[in-house]
């Protein structure tokens, strides 16, 4: 029977070939730190009690490996939660801005948008660019970049973020926009 003797570095290489590099680096730093910070008599005491050579180093290695995995998972979870928090905050601020703009629309601006909402169109149709349409473009409610001529009329698309809020706050019975409250 032929025995195969493997170098410890080859064994470690095979173990860590499937591990992410970041986790491996955490593990090495934790392992070396634990070995350096542990008192000198602990390895001797453990070896005497158990009788297996270098069991202390293997134990510390296993501990470092477990800590590295948990640190890696915790940092990934914390990072994902932080990103979700920032996204929710950005969406909330954007919704508040949209609601604020809709709340402060003049009567003429509101009527222009009501005409489009009443007909179910996602754009405003006009024969020329009136001052209140220019104001809606400046507010960002209408998109001038994608406006197009349709015969004698100009079509100004309503921005998507405003469209969803306008549809939610539109009252078709009274043909008016009832702004929803801004969140606090």
UniProtKB/Swiss-Prot annotation:
Species of provenance: Escherichia phage lambda (Bacteriophage lambda)
Phylogenetic classification of the source organism: Viruses, Duplodnaviria, Heunggongvirae, Uroviricota, Caudoviricetes
Residue intervals passing through the bilayer: 23-39, 55-71
Short name of one Pfam family: SieB
InterPro entries the record matches: SieB (IPR025982)
Role played: Has a role in the prevention of superinfection by phages that are insensitive to repression.
Membrane topology: Multi-pass membrane protein
Name by which UniProt lists this protein: Superinfection exclusion protein B
A GO cellular-component term linked to this record: membrane
Alphabetical keyword list: Host membrane, Membrane, Transmembrane, Transmembrane helix
Signal sequence, renumbered to the chain: none
Location in or out of the cell: Host membrane
């Amino acid at each position: 029977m032929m025995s195969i003797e493997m170098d410890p570095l080859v064994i470690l290489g095979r173990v860590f070939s499937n591990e992410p590099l970041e986790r491996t680096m955490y593990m090495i730093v934790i392992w070396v730190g634990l070995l350096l910070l542990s008192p000198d008599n602990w390895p001797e005491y453990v070896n005497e009690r158990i009788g297996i050579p270098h069991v202390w180093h293997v134990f510390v290695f296993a501990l470092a490996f477990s800590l590295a995995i948990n640190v890696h998972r915790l940092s990934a979870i914390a990072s994902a939660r932080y990103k979700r928090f920032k996204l929710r905050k950005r969406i909330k601020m954007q919704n508040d801005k949209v609601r604020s703009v809709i709340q402060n629309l003049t009567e003429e601006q509101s009527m222009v948008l009501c005409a489009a909402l009443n007909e179910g169109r996602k754009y405003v149709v006009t024969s020329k660019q009136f001052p209140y349409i220019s104001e809606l473009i400046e507010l960002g409610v209408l998109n001038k970049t994608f406006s197009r001529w349709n015969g004698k009329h100009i079509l100004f698309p309503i921005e998507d973020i405003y469209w969803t809020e306008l549809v939610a706050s539109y009252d078709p019975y009274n043909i008016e926009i009832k702004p929803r409250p801004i969140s606090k």
